Amino acid sequence: MDGSSPLLAAAGSDGDRSSSEGEYTLAGGPSAGDTEKREGESPMEAAGAGTVGFSISRLDTLSALRLNRTRPAADTELRYLHLLWKPGELLQAGRSTPGKITSSRVRRLARARRNMGPIGKDLHAVKRLREAANSNDIDTVRRLLEDDTDPCAADDKGRTALHFSSCNGNETIVQLLLSYGADPNQRDSLGNTPLHLAACTNHVPVITTLLRGGARVDALDRAGRTPLHLARSKLNILQEGDSRSLETLRGEVTQIIQMLREYLNIMGQSEEREKLEHISTQLQNTRTREQVDEVTDLLASFTSLSIQMQNMGDR
């Protein structure tokens, strides 16, 4: 016997009301020490506590509990069932309802309990992680990851924290997320991977980091573009512009070489990798803007040739 009365059983089974709508129970008879315990009672509890009481006899030799009704009455049961489903009539009758809980308050309390549960906390944490990644808040990202927040949790559009940080070009956050197990190949609802988003926004260092973290190059772009195509586009921009300083230009060309190095390693193209290393050495020895431009042109030609060879191999 679990200690529940027939009244409680009937109330719980009639329609199986959702817990979010609140659950009402009948308490025992009032006593001087029950004041603090009765603060959260429903109107039905407040009205019925003094009319129907329950007592439990001592355990017999079979260790069974016998529940004894002190004042049973069929019409009283029906009356309290009626009050259970229509608690508002207590107010209309002018009865005192200390500690009453309205249905809206019950729903709010139930919602608050759900939100403070493990699932609610997790949902809040992963949302904060995505927001922090999108706003480049690395301190919050690190703290949430240290608290075991899932880095692969996506929003309703399939976007993860890694998608946001890759699109923003934040290499530090991308590396941090990868170190905590973020999936570089996870797709959003449109089929985009973090690598694809980094490519679309021309964030070469992020692409390099994603490639090192295990990103699949064949999932870079649904249009079939690879880091080679991105490198060529980036180099074309560098060749057309002349506003960059020598160090800035050298740094951007170096980033492109690093990206291509990771890509060629994944593809297993050792011969192409050797040619790239030769170009990288030439870049390191440059001292003037003209020399950097020459290396840039050489790298652009290398990239175009590699794309042609790749296209021939795909046929």
Swiss-Prot record:
InterPro entries for the chain: Ankyrin_rpt (IPR002110), Ankyrin_rpt-contain_sf (IPR036770)
Swiss-Prot/TrEMBL keywords: ANK repeat, Cytoplasm, Nucleus, Repeat
Compartments, record wording: Nucleus; Cytoplasm; Midbody
Any one of the GO BP annotations: regulation of intracellular signal transduction
Location (main, coarse): nucleus
A Gene Ontology cellular-component term: cytoplasm
Origin: domain of life: Eukaryota
Pfam families associated with the record: Ank_2 (PF12796)
Gene3D superfamilies noted in UniProt: Ankyrin repeat-containing domain
Record keyword Magnesium present: no
Ranges for the ANK repeats: 124-153, 157-186, 190-219, 223-255
Span list, region Disordered: 1-49
Function: Plays an important role in regulating intracellular signaling events associated with erythroid terminal differentiation.
Protein name per Swiss-Prot or TrEMBL: Ankyrin repeat domain-containing protein 54
Gene: ankrd54
